[in-house]
């Protein structure tokens, strides 16, 4: 179904500016590619060590490949990271809303891998990107060598009532009076650490991107059991969206070769600090070895 990530042309330009701003934070050269898929040309960024192991990285909702790469600097020193822009979530992605209840997003990603001539890959997904990564691995397990998930959607959901209580009133207050203090109240349930650039970007998306209220469906037990490749799942101990303890417990109980870790103090948006970036890169490298 056709969809638009932006509300109007002015919003699109602002979102494109933010995309380039995050892209400028990525260390080293970044290659831009257009890859054919059944739904049209898809935008992909490629960065990192040219002879390193390939990792396909999928970004969270309402962000983009540039945003994720900007947080993976230490990993880029060791790995070749391929980051597609997801449909209906990024200003550089396909303006197309694919269904969540079937394998449409997985088929799109498999088209991207085919276009890049990548047969079997290491797959890493964050939040919404974690849902797409898990879905792809369950759909075509022969295409995924190893699967890493960070605060993934589609495994275990938090309380909608709790989320509403913590965010709805601050959101209304911020929309009526968009001050920095009110923005902090909106984002505090989600952000582990306060980052000026990320907070300003999210404020921009609240103004410029339509809200997509869909929640990825929970994976069935059978879908998780089909994950026969090595799996690493990292959950946020204070994630109200997708509670880390439930996420880690479910994946490690169902996937036969899964390892899980609960990140202390981590909300849904992990720390935007160099210390966490270094920790994540080291954890992923150990998993890939």
Segment roles from a protein language model:
Residues 227, 233-235:
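Short beta-strand/loop motif that positions the catalytic acidic residue
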Residues 1-53, 78-79, 274, 281-289:
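Alpha/beta-hydrolase fold catalytic core
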């Amino acid at each position: 179904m056709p969809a638009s990530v932006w509300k109007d042309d002015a919003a699109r330009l602002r979102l494109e500016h933010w995309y380039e701003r995050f892209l400028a934070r990525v260390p080293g050269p970044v290659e831009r590619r257009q890859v054919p898929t059944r739904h049209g040309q898809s935008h992909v960024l490629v960065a990192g060590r040219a002879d390193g192991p390939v990792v396909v990285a999928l970004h969270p909702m309402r962000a983009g490949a540039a945003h994720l790469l900007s947080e993976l600097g230490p990993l880029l020193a060791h790995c070749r990271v391929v980051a597609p822009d997801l449909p209906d979530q990024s200003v550089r992605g396909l303006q197309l809303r694919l269904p969540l209840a079937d394998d449409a997003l997985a088929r799109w990603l498999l088209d991207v891998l085919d276009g890049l001539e990548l047969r079997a890959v290491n797959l890493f997904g964050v939040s919404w990107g974690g849902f797409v990564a898990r879905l792809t691995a369950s759909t075509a397990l022969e295409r995924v060598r190893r699967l890493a998930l960070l605060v993934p959607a589609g495994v275990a959901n938090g309380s909608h009532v709790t989320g509403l209580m913590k965010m709805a009133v601050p959101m209304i207050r911020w929309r009526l009076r968009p001050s920095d203090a009110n923005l902090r109240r909106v984002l505090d349930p989600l952000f582990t650490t306060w980052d000026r650039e990320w907070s300003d970007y999210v404020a921009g998306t609240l103004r410029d991107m339509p809200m997509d209220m869909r929640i990825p469906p929970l994976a069935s037990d059978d879908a998780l059991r089909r994950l026969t490749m090595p799996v690493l799942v990292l959950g946020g101990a204070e994630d109200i969206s997708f509670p880390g303890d439930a996420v880690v417990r479910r994946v490690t109980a169902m996937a036969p070769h899964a390892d899980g870790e609960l990140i202390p103090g981590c909300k849904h948006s992990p720390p935007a600090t160099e210390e966490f970036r270094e920790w994540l890169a080291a954890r992923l490298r150990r998993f890939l070895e």
